[in-house]
Amino acid sequence: MPRLFGTDGVRGLANGETITADLALRLAQAAAHVLGQDARDAGRRPVAVVARDPRVSGEFIAAAVAAGLASSGVDVFDAGVIPTPATAYLIADFDADFGVMISASHNPAPDNGIKFFAAGGRKLADELEDRIEAQLSQPVLLPTGADVGRIRRFADAEDRYVLHLLGTLQHRLDGIHVVLDCAHGAAAGISPEVSTDAGARVTVIGNDPDGMNINDRVGSTHLDLLAEAVLGHGADVGIAYDGDADRCLAVDHTGAIIDGDQIMAVLALSMARRGLLVERTLVATVMSNLGLRIAMAENDITVLQTRVGDRYVLEAMNEGGYSLGGEQSGHLVIAEHATTGDGILTGIQLLGEMAATGRSLHELASVMTVYPQVMINVRGVDRERVSDDAELNAAVARAEAELGDTGRILMRASGTEPMIRVMVEAADQATAERHAQELAALVTERLAI
């Protein structure tokens, strides 16, 4: 039987095979048993924060989760619609024992998900997820009478988070005109309030969630509308979030996209200049652009590479005590202020660097040359043999020798389907495409099932 928890909680079509009200209630009861144990051992009632993004299905799923927790003796504080990183922050700020976020992040509106955070607002370790999943098949012993939990509204949840974000800024944002694309998601309302209170001139798009329009041709996965708005309004910069605002990407005043690698480069240099980049080390995944590593090396900054996925970035940061990490997709973790990726925090720190230096985002991002990157997904192949095929390995070695220091090759097996991802970076697009196509064809020839 496949594992219920994926790389980012439990996710699927709401009211489909996985994400149902019944599962939400039972999963919450199982989580209450596992994550509330320390509180019960200390002789007190566990406390949990529950929140959601604006998807229409979030209402019944959050209600089922709250019912499952309260029926298990957990006091629930319902924060309503707030970003995922706000939930993580509030768990720590409120000293809750754990929390639950109902969201499917950048997925379309019909999907939804259930994600748990441990005490301190930290993502769950695999071991805790496995214990929760195992608990689903165990008998449920529920309290009665005065021992059941209460469900209360977390009245000042949004205000606490807004004040936290404003407190992270070193400079006001006066004089900066920013277009914010809130993806009709959890950033709506909050992000414009933060940027306005910090002094920026704000134009907003994607700020009218109706429960079904989240991520619909807006947000960090659809940047065309943001680029048009930046150019049309003559703005200095644009920032786009995904549905739960745990990531952001940007657009400079020319309409050019500034991805997560470029944002990391800008913030790493800023933090290094201020003595805040621990061990002058940036944590990034193997998918980050070669240009990021080159730019950081030129500034005496080490790039520590991890597997793909923000959870692996977080693990490396926590193990090494590092202060900044992230992904090309725009998931950035600024450890001084957050325990998980926070798009609104990342965005205002980027604006803060513009304000502090008086430089445009176009100028700041120019520290890094983005190498052309070509990715080909080769399906229907035996992913287990990718590292053992001698002819394929020889072809990769020849291509790497030709690229030298001006490119790289990455072959990565999918963890969920018979597919190999072939990624090639080179100094020019044509070279990257040529090597990627040649290697993809060889993968098909050698590893076809």
Swiss-Prot record:
Record's cofactor remark: Binds 1 Mg(2+) ion per subunit.
UniProt cross-references to Gene3D superfamilies, sorted A to Z: Alpha-D-Glucose-1,6-Bisphosphate, subunit A, domain 3 (3.40.120.10), Alpha-D-phosphohexomutase, C-terminal domain (3.30.310.50)
Reaction catalysis annotation: alpha-D-glucosamine 1-phosphate = D-glucosamine 6-phosphate
Entry EC no(s): 5.4.2.10
Residues carrying Phosphoserine: S105
Protein's UniProt keywords contain Thylakoid: no
Any GO CC annotation of this UniProt entry: cytosol
Highest taxon listed in the record's lineage: Bacteria
Cofactor: Mg(2+)
The keyword Transmembrane belongs to this UniProt entry's keyword annotation: no
Binding site for Mg(2+): S105, D242, D244, D246
Post-translational modification: Activated by phosphorylation.
UniProt xrefs under SUPFAM superfamilies: Phosphoglucomutase, C-terminal domain, Phosphoglucomutase, first 3 domains
Residues at the catalytic site: S105 (phosphoserine intermediate)
Function: Catalyzes the conversion of glucosamine-6-phosphate to glucosamine-1-phosphate.
HAMAP family: GlmM_B (MF_01554_B)
Family: Belongs to the phosphohexose mutase family.
Name of the protein: Phosphoglucosamine mutase
Organism of derivation: Clavibacter sepedonicus
Lineage: Bacteria, Bacillati, Actinomycetota, Actinomycetes, Micrococcales
Gene: glmM
